[in-house]
Amino acid sequence: MFSTHHVSRLLIPLLFFFLFCCFSSTFAQDDITNPVEVRALRVIKESLNDPVHRLRNWKHGDPCNSNWTGVVCFNSTLDDGYLHVSELQLFSMNLSGNLSPELGRLSRLTILSFMWNKITGSIPKEIGNIKSLELLLLNGNLLNGNLPEELGFLPNLDRIQIDENRISGPLPKSFANLNKTKHFHMNNNSISGQIPPELGSLPSIVHILLDNNNLSGYLPPELSNMPRLLILQLDNNHFDGTTIPQSYGNMSKLLKMSLRNCSLQGPVPDLSSIPNLGYLDLSQNQLNGSIPAGKLSDSITTIDLSNNSLTGTIPTNFSGLPRLQKLSLANNALSGSIPSRIWQERELNSTESIIVDLRNNGFSNISGRSDLRPNVTVWLQGNPLCSDGNLLRLCGPITEEDINQGSTNSNTTICSDCPPPYEFSPEPLRRCFCAAPLLVGYRLKSPGFSDFVPYRSEFEQYITSGLSLNLYQLRLDSFQWQKGPRLRMYLKFFPVFGSNANNSFIFNRSEVRRIRGMFTGWNIRDEDLFGPYELMNFTLLDVYRDVFPSASPSGLSNGAVAGIVLGSVAAAVTLTAIIALIIMRKRMRGYSAVARRKRSSKASLKIEGVKSFTYAELALATDNFNSSTQIGQGGYGKVYKGTLGSGTVVAIKRAQEGSLQGEKEFLTEIELLSRLHHRNLVSLLGFCDEEGEQMLVYEYMENGTLRDNISVKLKEPLDFAMRLRIALGSAKGILYLHTEANPPIFHRDIKASNILLDSRFTAKVADFGLSRLAPVPDMEGISPQHVSTVVKGTPGYLDPEYFLTHQLTDKSDVYSLGVVLLELFTGMQPITHGKNIVREINIAYESGSILSTVDKRMSSVPDECLEKFATLALRCCREETDARPSMAEVVRELEIIWELMPESHVAKTADLSETMTHPSSSSNSSIMKHHYTSMDVSGSDLVSGVAPSVAPR
């Protein structure tokens, strides 16, 4: 046995040996970063708030030698003998604070990226000192103030992206000096004043995106002098009374012209001389006169001239356009015949479709055949020809299933599940090959089409060839149209089997860095059809945690570390077991201290009204999240049925990769949900935020979803009184979200599968949260009465006005609930075999046969109640938002119908809720009626049984 004295005698010389190695390696360390840039980086960090500690390794060591997060350096020293920072990539790190003027001291910088953070304040003029800068990427922040004149003196700038901020003031005339700039993205700000005519002299510009600003004055004819301009996008500005210059018809390279809602007047210019024009949107202006007769390019996919004051007839040149996807001439004063050749002569394959929107004009007839193929949609509502009963199918309201708004891969397989975070690779030669993908959020900022499906295969080839990957390494998980229109995508890239000698299931480090660098450096070539893209996020799963290693706490450079390793080889030979044991015991004590601190931190987290569960508690409740306990899956993640130690049965929502939030955002959402209490909302019982997991614990609903209870043939199907009770409860829950939650919440995804039923068949609305808050005015100047965002709805339930306005309101929830009411009335699904429930029931109502659509499984009910119920449902589903009732009116009318129900039906409903579930206390029918009605919906009944913890707004 070694005594303490013997151990000390061994440790002392060993300590001196290690110190010698450290000092020796320090003198032999690598080249260091320019001291001016080191000081600048430290000041830059001090000006930022870093709540998730992404920049924690900026405290130690040398930026270039110690792998500082987001810092990329040149590979060798420059003429001053120092290393220099070449890129500062701090995108999507949840940073806030201000941009420091010290950025101007990074004199050799080529890429400056703070995209998708929460940076406030103004843009430092000192950035204009970085003459080497090629990419200035500040989009997706909260920056304000004017654009500095100094930015116009960056001679090497290729791309300037300051979109989606709060920038105001004019465009500096100095921008006319940006002779190398190709991409000019300033959209979604509050930039005002005249577009400088001097910009027309820029020789390299290919994309001008200035939409959603406050620009005014006139449209400079000089813009037509740009020799390489491909995209001109100026939507939603205020060029009061100005006309579109005829010279814009001479933009020979132009692919897309979008001047929607710009207060433009005068005639539509003749654009027939633009050989490759693919997208034209001049809608929502005050253009007048007739549509030019010149034939547009065969490349055209979209023509939108709706909401103007155009007169005359549809020109014959709109027929025979081989790539046309959308023609919208709605809300004009056009007349005459509609040439059916527009859609009859369009050759369509199985992936292609065409939409022709001619609503609200003066068309009197259709020339040619009026029959439609399955992938052709024609809207004629509001024209004189709709008086012809044979055209009723073309004159109904718009429904969203006619428009391609998104897609998700099914990814079905006969293989057993991959262990998280691995997924089945799409590699064709290796079935059931599990691999860890790279997750990329990607957005096309100005696509040249209206329907993505026909171009999906072409896009997949474009992106994989640009990244030098095989086509099968990409899975386009889903895509969604956003306001703009812009196209958001969720991409997954998989490694090739056997490509990584150490681990076939993941990309090697160099490949991850290469792919990431291609995206962050905008090194994927532009494709005319897809337009400019932007990187929304690049997510690395935990298995890739070593790809971008953090600096060691010691702050030693790579050379120093190498010296220590080499010098320590000899020491390792003499290291005894007792010393190893001592070191291990010290480490164990250190780990225990860290674990205690973590437990203490979590234990101190208290949110009133909900419990903070440990990961172990929820794993135990679900048999370690056994697949046998899974009861559902949604956009947030998988849902498990669990039994807590107390015996309480709960539903546990476990966030999947892509749904995880920052800790602050997650806890903010928990705090909001904990304050929502109503008997018709699913109650949040607790949460878990540890072990890299985020989970929500809800009360368990024994009778599942309303969708299940309508579609499944129960021994005793739900009768009308029970369905009416469910409808009333659902409406009250939604009304609470609209009027009593603080801030108010628009649900945005009301559907039968989001209405759950407890043991007594009480309806409880589920799946609401922070992502659905009624908004305050944002950077686009949108009013606080609606949400403008990625559509969250479900086909069949989504407000049709969304496809015109890209806005969701409280009336959008009314529309969705109306669809649910129609489901309750008919037993049908929203969309079945291409038939839309709203359209079908409207047709039946107009023909006087509404009662023929009643679900035959229900017992007889007074016709008066059924007709009032159906009429209310159809009012909720009116195409025009203003024509729909408010949610408060819906509740009142449902209560009136409930009062009209015979006592025998109400009593039977009470009995049904008893016999179909666990025994509970009885109540007579009069009590049942009183319990579910209250003519003053703003009073006690709305919040009866509700803890008054949310103050009215």
Swiss-Prot record:
InterPro entries: Kinase-like_dom_sf, Leu-rich_rpt, LRR_dom_sf, LRR_N_plant-typ, Prot_kinase_dom, Protein_kinase_ATP_BS, Ser-Thr/Tyr_kinase_cat_dom, Ser/Thr_kinase_AS
Pfam families linked to this entry: LRR_8, LRRNT_2, PK_Tyr_Ser-Thr
Keyword set, alphabetical order: ATP-binding, Glycoprotein, Kinase, Leucine-rich repeat, Membrane, Nucleotide-binding, Receptor, Repeat, Serine/threonine-protein kinase, Signal, Transferase, Transmembrane, Transmembrane helix
GO molecular function: ATP binding; protein serine kinase activity; protein serine/threonine kinase activity
Residues in LRR repeats: 85-106, 107-130, 132-155, 156-177, 180-203, 204-226, 228-251, 253-275, 276-298, 299-322, 323-345, 352-373, 374-395, 845-868
Glycosylated position list: 67, 75, 94, 179, 188, 214, 250, 261, 288, 307, 317, 349, 365, 375, 411, 502, 508, 537
Record-listed ATP binding positions: I631, G632, Q633, G634, G635, Y636, G637, K638, V639, K653
Transmembrane segments: 564-584
Homology family: Belongs to the protein kinase superfamily. Ser/Thr protein kinase family.
Active-site residue numbers: D749
Signal peptide: 1-28
Record topology, Cytoplasmic segments: 585-953
Annotated Protein kinase domain residues: 625-897
EC number: 2.7.11.1
Top EC group: transferase
GO cellular component terms given for this protein: plasma membrane
Catalytic activity reported: L-seryl-[protein] + ATP = O-phospho-L-seryl-[protein] + ADP + H(+); L-threonyl-[protein] + ATP = O-phospho-L-threonyl-[protein] + ADP + H(+)
The organism of origin for this protein: Arabidopsis thaliana
Source domain of life: Eukaryota
Entry protein name: Probable LRR receptor-like serine/threonine-protein kinase At1g06840
